[in-house]
Amino acid sequence: DVDSAQFVRIQLFNSAYYQVYQASWNNLTSFDLGQLKNLHSKFIKKLSLENVIRLNSKQSENTAFLDRLNPLYFLKNGSEVLSFQSYFNQNIYFNRANPIYDIQCSRLESKSRFLYISGNDERFNLDYNIRSRATIQKKFDVILNISQRVESQLIASYALQNFKINSTKVEPEI
């Protein structure tokens, strides 16, 4: 008898259940260089870094056992990969949480691919962002956000819904 928790319902005409295997990896890494005692550079001590990685892949029951445990298996692009999702977020902070000024640079990337009966559905987003904040006379903050984004979608079954959009945004705030 097979545990039904390993089954995922995939909407088909006959509403059948198919066994799939899921592998995922979540990672958060954070470095505050100001905590290092032996650094003599005041500039470097004001930096902090943060990195978030999330990977999730689902494979068919025909996948080899070791590949079922591998969250990077989607890189092989085989027919056993039913879906994958990846998320990467990197941030560099300068003078983080300082009451006078701070600067933040970030990169966010997300990808997903789903295998349907009609073909693959792929989505991709990439964002670059720079944010700076300065306090003026201890009364108000001036903030500037600059971002650049690439967003795309590729659907094998319906080419009219495919797109790739590049955008740039500048947002000053007081």
Residue ranges of each PLM-predicted region?
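Exposed, low-structure sequence patches enriched in small/polar residues
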Residues: 1-174
